Amino acid sequence: MVMCVRAVLVCVLLELSRAAPHAHINRLALFPDKSAWCEAKNITQIVGHTGCTPRSIQNRACLGQCFSYSVPNTFPQSTESLVHCDSCMPAQTQWEVVTLDCSGSDEAPRVDKLVERILHCSCQSCSKESSQEGALLQLYPHEGAQDLPSLPDATHTHPQHAHMQADQRDADAHLDMHAPEAG
């Protein structure tokens, strides 16, 4: 009985690994009552810098449970490696400049920090790089801070495909290049 279950598992996982370069898995045959989920949850993020007054901004964090599995391999290898890893991570983001008041600092009266705002999250490959297509890059300079778009209310569990965008006016924004601080 155990060998039969293992054989079925190997067959199911082998078919899944052949389906697409990296298909999102919402359910596994061994756990039909469990499903993957990934949501963008509202948070308050504190943006700070040494010598500056920290600012609180509304942002989102990705939270969820996505599937991963690894089936023991053989040597020499008789089948494709049966390893899959998904993680709940941003599917769509935008960048904005947050200006901090540093009136007590000798270096500068203010510092601009580049902050990633999360719009949507989804289960995606653990090996996904942040520069991959699907990221929405919009940089909002501090001069137009009052015109920033608000975060959408709806959350999505599927990847949102967007295009890389950057206006010429964004190139004029001053960015703080120091290592990010906690928070």
From Swiss-Prot:
<feature type="region of interest" description="Disordered">
    <location>
        <begin position="145"/>
        <end position="170"/>
    </location>
</feature>
<dbReference type="GO" id="GO:0038098">
    <property type="term" value="P:sequestering of BMP from receptor via BMP binding"/>
</dbReference>
<dbReference type="Pfam" id="PF03045">
    <property type="entry name" value="DAN"/>
</dbReference>
<keyword id="KW-0732">Signal</keyword>
<dbReference type="GO" id="GO:0048018">
    <property type="term" value="F:receptor ligand activity"/>
</dbReference>
<protein>
    <recommendedName>
        <fullName>Neuroblastoma suppressor of tumorigenicity 1</fullName>
    </recommendedName>
</protein>
<dbReference type="InterPro" id="IPR004133">
    <property type="entry name" value="DAN"/>
</dbReference>
<feature type="domain" description="CTCK">
    <location>
        <begin position="38"/>
        <end position="127"/>
    </location>
</feature>
<dbReference type="GO" id="GO:0060876">
    <property type="term" value="P:semicircular canal formation"/>
</dbReference>
<feature type="disulfide bond">
    <location>
        <begin position="66"/>
        <end position="123"/>
    </location>
</feature>
<keyword id="KW-0043">Tumor suppressor</keyword>
<feature type="disulfide bond">
    <location>
        <begin position="52"/>
        <end position="102"/>
    </location>
</feature>
<keyword id="KW-0964">Secreted</keyword>
<dbReference type="InterPro" id="IPR029034">
    <property type="entry name" value="Cystine-knot_cytokine"/>
</dbReference>
<feature type="signal peptide">
    <location>
        <begin position="1"/>
        <end position="19"/>
    </location>
</feature>
<dbReference type="InterPro" id="IPR006207">
    <property type="entry name" value="Cys_knot_C"/>
</dbReference>
<dbReference type="GO" id="GO:0036122">
    <property type="term" value="F:BMP binding"/>
</dbReference>
<feature type="disulfide bond">
    <location>
        <begin position="62"/>
        <end position="121"/>
    </location>
</feature>
<comment type="function">
    <text>May act as a tumor suppressor.</text>
</comment>
<dbReference type="InterPro" id="IPR016728">
    <property type="entry name" value="Neuroblast_suppress_tumour_1"/>
</dbReference>
<feature type="disulfide bond">
    <location>
        <begin position="38"/>
        <end position="88"/>
    </location>
</feature>
<keyword id="KW-1015">Disulfide bond</keyword>
<dbReference type="GO" id="GO:0005615">
    <property type="term" value="C:extracellular space"/>
</dbReference>
<comment type="similarity">
    <text>Belongs to the DAN family.</text>
</comment>
<feature type="disulfide bond">
    <location>
        <begin position="85"/>
        <end position="126"/>
    </location>
</feature>
<dbReference type="GO" id="GO:0060872">
    <property type="term" value="P:semicircular canal development"/>
</dbReference>
